[in-house]
Amino acid sequence: MAKEKFVKNKPHVNVGTIGHVDHGKTTLSAAISAVLATKGLAELKDYDNIDNAPEEKERGITIATSHIEYETENRHYAHVDCPGHADYVKNMITGAAQMDGAILVVSAADGPMPQTREHILLSRQVGVHYIVVFLNKQDMVDDAELLELVEMEVRELLSQYDFPGDDTPIIAGSALKALEEAKAGNVGEWGEKVLKLMEEVDKYIPTPQRDTEKTFLMPVEDVFSIAGRGTVVTGRVERGVVQVGDEVEIVGIRDTQKTTVTGVEMFRKELDKGEAGDNVGILLRGTKKEEVERGMVLCKPGSITPHKKFEGEIYVLSKDEGGRHTPFFNGYRPQFYVRTTDVTGSIELPSGVEMVMPGDNVKITVELIAPVALEDGTRFAIREGGRTVGSGVVTKIIE
């Protein structure tokens, strides 16, 4: 019997639950899967099943994450839920679990709490642009005015971090009650609220662009010269499509150069084009081997530019994760591993921050010694002598 093939007839979207500890993120994750399971759109995942999240290693960082999948009438979703606050921080900064949008869970009984704020800020920093809110534990709030007050607070908090607070969909309900109903095999008034939430997620979080639809970019891994044919650069296409005859730019380390693609090869076979995810060799017209090196990128002209100075949000590995055993201070000069190469840079800490301890997350300003192709959302690792000591994401280009 052939293994069932993953049917790609519905658009795929990645989401995750965020919010303060004990506000009900995991219960909501279980409730969504249980309610949709009654309609045959999900496999029932129990709370304990989601809560005992397996630990994964992502670039040496230990992150506990649960993955569940489900469908609505319109879409297929992959949904991540993390048991601990630290796991969320690591997940969002490393990009280990991509999120196209987030479901922010706020307890109606408590209102926004410190981690509510921190997760909203992190979403803003790492480029999760769409948030839908679930006001949980509505069954514990008798006063309609109190519920309205919490909703207003959440909208204000979202607006404070540049999210459209006034237009954000907010659904009130009870994840626990919906879960209990669904386990009894029916969708009652509480289950309907979870369905309403998913309807809003369907409408409000846009379907992401597929990687092949984005502008072409390929990090250079290696460079060869082939007698009589010219220079070949190899790498894995990160996004977009490249075809023979395309004009491309070579960006990073040195001055940007323009050239034309004269051949695309994969496994020694000539191709018409290479696309996102392909490991290819690209033949470049008139480019000398010594003009290209690992760490540069090939890209669609004008789509990405080289930069030396940027702001970033980083997570510093703990000692247990194989990170540093001691804090670092202002002016710390590690290597920044961006895509395929290490570039030395110095770190400036925010005013008022004396030092950064292993296991912390912090906003930093970095100045590299050589320009690298960067944009908002570019991920990087921080290394010392080849050993990863941190992970980060570019939040703002300075120059």
From Swiss-Prot:
UniProt keyword list: Cytoplasm, Elongation factor, GTP-binding, Hydrolase, Magnesium, Metal-binding, Nucleotide-binding, Protein biosynthesis
Residues the entry annotates as binding Mg(2+): 26
Region (G1): 19-26
Occurrences of domain tr-type G (ranges): 10-209
Residue span of region G3: 81-84
Stretch list, region G2: 60-64
Chain positions covered by the region annotation G5: 174-176
Reaction(s) catalysed (UniProt annotation): GTP + H2O = GDP + phosphate + H(+)
Source superkingdom: Bacteria
Stored InterPro entries: EF-Tu_GTP-bd, EF-Tu_GTPase, EFTu-like_2, EFTU_2, G_TR_CS, P-loop_NTPase, Small_GTP-bd, T_Tr_GTP-bd_dom
Class of the enzyme per the UniProt entry, highest EC level: hydrolase
GO cellular component entries: cytosol
Residues that, per the record, bind GTP: 19-26, 81-85, 136-139
Region G4, residue ranges: 136-139
UniProt family annotation: Belongs to the TRAFAC class translation factor GTPase superfamily. Classic translation factor GTPase family. EF-Tu/EF-1A subfamily.
Task performed by this protein: GTP hydrolase that promotes the GTP-dependent binding of aminoacyl-tRNA to the A-site of ribosomes during protein biosynthesis.
Record note on quaternary structure: Monomer.
Entry protein name: Elongation factor Tu
Organism of derivation: Helicobacter hepaticus (strain ATCC 51449 / 3B1)
